[in-house]
C-alpha cells in the first residue's frame, strides 16, 4: 500500500517509501490548535484523543 506521509508544515505530500504494507491502513488526521487547523497523513490507524478527526482507508493514496 502507498500512503501519503505529510504534516501540514511539509510543502508537499511524499510517499512513505515502503513503510506501509498490504494489511496496513492509511490515515488522515485533522485537529485545531491556537494557530489554526493542522493535518497529518501517514500509515496505520492509531487511536486518537477526543477533538482529533481521524479518517482511515485501505487503498493506495486514499489519504490525500
From Swiss-Prot:
Top-rank taxon, per record: Eukaryota
Molecular function (Gene Ontology), one example: acetylcholine receptor inhibitor activity
Tissues where this protein is expressed: Expressed by the venom gland.
Family matches, as SUPFAM superfamilies: Snake toxin-like
Subcellular location field: Secreted
Pfam family, one: Toxin_cobra-type
GO CC annotations on file: extracellular region
Disulphide bonds in the chain: 3-26, 20-43, 45-56, 57-62
Family: Belongs to the three-finger toxin family. Short-chain subfamily. Type I alpha-neurotoxin sub-subfamily.
Name of this chain's protein: Short neurotoxin 1
Amino acid at each position: 500500500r502507498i500512503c501519503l506521509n505529510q504534516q501540514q508544515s511539509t510543502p508537499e505530500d511524499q510517499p512513505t517509501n515502503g513503510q506501509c504494507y498490504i494489511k496496513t491502513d492509511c490515515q488522515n488526521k485533522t485537529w485545531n490548535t491556537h494557530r489554526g487547523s493542522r493535518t497529518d497523513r501517514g500509515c496505520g490507524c492509531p487511536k486518537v484523543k477526543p477533538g482529533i478527526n481521524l479518517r482511515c482507508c485501505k487503498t493506495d493514496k486514499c489519504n490525500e
